[in-house]
Amino acid sequence: MWRGLSALVTRPASAPLRLCARCSTGAESLVPGSTIFALSSGQGRCAIAVIRTSGPASGLALRSLTALREPPPARSACLRLLRHPCSGEPLDRSLVLWFPGPQSFTGEDCMELHVHGGPAVVSGVLQALGSVPGLRPAKAGEFTRRAFAHGKLSLTEVEGLADLIHAETEAQRRQALRQLDGELSQLCQGWAKTLTKALAHVEAYIDFGEDDNLEEGVLEQVDRDVRALEVALSSHLRDARRGQRLRSGANVVVAGPPNAGKSSLVNLLSQKPVSIVSPEPGTTRDILETPVDLAGFPVLLSDTAGLREGAGAVEQEGVRRARQRLEQADIILGMLDASDLASSSSCSFLDTVVAPLVAQSHDSGRQRLLLLLNKSDLLSANAPASSTALPPHLLLSCHTGAGMDALLQALKTELAAVCGDPSTGPPLLTRARHQYHLQGCLDALGRFQLTTDLALAAEALRQARRQLSHLTGGGGTEEILDLIFQDFCVGK
């Protein structure tokens, strides 16, 4: 990304400092800015609740509720009895922590009260804080927004914090933590330094091009640096979809002819009865979706109608939707009945779905299909699954669970390929906003390469650097910032 409170007259420690909206203290004039407070831990009954404040009146709030003459030692917990500032009524015994700015999460004076988590206790403490002059309830994400405004977090780190709060799988947690730790921000800063150096050299050549003291090959070095940066940006843009899948979930679609066991597999993978299982063909007639954690990766698992011709109008609409969903899938689990591979529906699925997908995976260098032969328990011990040549496949029995471990391992490999491994490699682009600004930077570098006018070349470099600045939060519009901070709860 391109404190203070005046002295207050305190009462003796034995008596609580009584400051509230209806107490005549004149303390409002001592508070230069707004101070916010909120419950930071989860709603509902719990063992411990954390209530925090941020702003110049945090010290006043601390003294008002605890009767302390001075704040306790910074970042050290002390046990105090909390009293209402107006009535002096005891509220709870609390651990009190004091974080003076700028060495705090928001960069402002902050206080945390760790109280018992009963709803009445939390409500009473929040009401007491609301009676202190200069304090108001925080808005959603306002603590984090203040941290951003004071340079404690870049915008990509803010997004990483939001993703960490909402992470539901191990892969999401790892990716969010890397982004919160600033890896994406640091990568962008490195690119920005390259552009700044290139821009300085171009402008130096414009100003001192005829000067003998200017080193030779300055523009040639700029050109090499910009081309190397273009390669790096292009590589990250190619991986952008992987990061978005990791954040939102990969689309895994189960498809196949009727009665192949698709619904049984969906129920097994999701570990809950998502789909109705019946021996009658055509039971599933619409797309059934469920979010699943598979091998630590977020997945949107879809059950689809059995693919066959000649069914009724309603089932044919389900087949049409199933084929449409196949086009949107990241990974397709193609299911066949291992005991009925010679049927017309199985042969049709192999010809119309499996064969094109196998050819496509060879062309793209990435496998998108896992072919599964279900009902392996119905095969005799010495009989092959089929006399016909099949693409690589896995034998599976949803009835006995045989082959599930091999399927989960294969899925883990495929998910790592389409989502990326959050533990290794460069940080991923997890949002469309990241992709937009990186593409804008790359477009500006393309204009730099095409122009022969040094002034236009310098302007192209400025535009490229500006796009990187927007990515990390520099010069961002209020509308975009509002959307990002709306993802946070009130106490964050």
Swiss-Prot record:
Cofactor note: Forms a homodimer in the presence of potassium.
GO molecular function: GTP binding; GTPase activity; tRNA 5-taurinomethyluridine synthase activity
Binding residue positions for 5,10-methylenetetrahydrofolate: R52, E112, K152, K492
Top-level taxon of origin: Eukaryota
Cofactor requirement: K(+)
UniProt keyword Hydrolase present: yes
Binding-site list for K(+): N259
CDD domains on file: trmE, TrmE_N
Coiled-coil annotated spans: none
Protein name according to UniProt: 5-taurinomethyluridine-[tRNA] synthase subunit GTPB3, mitochondrial
Organism: Rattus norvegicus (Rat)
Lineage of origin: Eukaryota, Metazoa, Chordata, Craniata, Vertebrata
